[in-house]
């Protein structure tokens, strides 16, 4: 899913960096899934962190966004030090959740709209997430590893 989002953004002209290492204000190591640099706005950069969660009745769009902002906003100064060519940009953290059963929230739809990505890719991404979830379950059930 992360690689697909990276590819879609790259096709739109964004410069994307994958698995960006950084350190937060407390010295904890973090890894940003996608650092995307906007080609059309010299003032914007995006820290994009998609995640897969089991769907609940909670507002997962809001929960994931708050969680990701809490994790990655304290890393922005370190990212600016590591990438001085982007130091003058305003950074925005975007947390995206994909449901482990193939669902998506409004946040994903809004992300596709904001970045002018074709929505026809959403079902393929959701299907990939679902297939990966099934594969993980299969490995847990049929693993030869005994505790």
Task: Give residue spans per PLM region.
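Active-site metal-binding core of divalent-cation-utilizing nuclease and nuclease-like domains
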Residues: 2-52
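Catalytic cores of nucleic-acid endonucleases
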Residues: 32, 38, 45-46, 50-147
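Phosphate/oxyanion-binding active-site loops and adjacent basic polyanion-contact surfaces
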Residues: 1, 27, 64-68
């Amino acid at each position: 899913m992360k690689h697909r989002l990276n590819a879609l953004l790259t096709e739109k002209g964004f410069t994307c960096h994958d698995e960006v290492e950084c350190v937060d204000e407390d010295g904890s190591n973090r890894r940003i899934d996608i650092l995307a640099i906007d080609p059309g706005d010299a003032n914007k950069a995006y820290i994009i962190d998609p995640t897969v969660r089991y769907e609940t009745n909670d507002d997962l769009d809001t929960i994931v966004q708050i969680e990701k902002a809490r994790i990655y906003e304290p890393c922005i100064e370190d990212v600016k030090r590591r990438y001085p060519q982007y130091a003058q940009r305003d950074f925005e953290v975007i947390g995206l959740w994909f449901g482990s059963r193939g669902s998506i929230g409004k946040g994903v739809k809004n992300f596709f709209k904001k970045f002018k990505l074709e929505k026809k890719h959403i079902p393929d991404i959701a299907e990939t997430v679902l297939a990966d979830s099934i594969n993980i379950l299969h490995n847990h059930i049929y693993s030869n590893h005994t505790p």
